[in-house]
């Protein structure tokens, strides 16, 4: 039996139960895989208080950065603006993704060891009504 390794960036602990489940191959054409996928999709719609056929959920594989980039580049409209609260590499990366993709953004940056302030976020939102996200 193969002993798969889960290679992920960042500080992360993978439990033995997750590692055990990883030993089973799920193939996209198998009925159990399809059932798992459909259950996840329905659950995501329910969490958003929406339903088919007006809405759907598409599962995408990728890193956390990939997930954030997919949202920023597909959800934010041309006439909308994102407020990025940055206090580290991930926030800097999100602002850079916005700039590279042509997504309007305002960056509220704090030192890497400082928690962003809810008061300052409110001030940014009040000062700039074009911020929509």
Spans of features found by a protein language model:
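N-terminal "arm"/small-domain region of PLP-dependent enzymes with the aminotransferase-like
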Residues: 1-31
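Conserved beta-strand segments of alpha/beta enzyme cores
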Residues: 56, 104-106
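A general structural motif
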Residues: 54, 79, 131-132
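Conserved beta-strand elements of the Class I
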Residues: 81-83
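Conserved N-terminal alpha-helix of the aminotransferase class I/II PLP-enzyme fold
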Residues: 21-70, 74, 89, 93-99
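Short beta->alpha junction loops
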Residues: 59-61, 108-114
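Active-site phosphate-binding strand-loop segment of PLP-dependent enzymes
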Residues: 115-133
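Active-site-proximal loop->helix
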Residues: 93-104, 111, 122-124
């Amino acid at each position: 039996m193969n002993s798969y390794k889960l290679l992920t960036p960042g500080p992360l602990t993978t439990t033995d139960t997750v590692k055990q489940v990883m030993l089973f191959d799920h193939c996209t054409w198998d009925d159990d895989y399809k059932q798992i996928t459909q259950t996840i999709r329905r659950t995501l719609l329910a969490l958003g208080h929406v339903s088919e056929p007006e809405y759907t959920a598409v599962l995408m594989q990728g890193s956390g950065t990939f997930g954030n980039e997919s949202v920023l580049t597909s959800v934010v409209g041309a006439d909308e603006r994102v407020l990025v609260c940055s206090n580290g590499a991930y926030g800097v990366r999100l602002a850079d993704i916005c700039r590279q993709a042509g997504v309007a953004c305002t960056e509220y940056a704090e030192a890497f060891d400082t928690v962003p302030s809810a008061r300052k976020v409110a001030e940014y939102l009040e000062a700039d009504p074009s911020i929509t996200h």
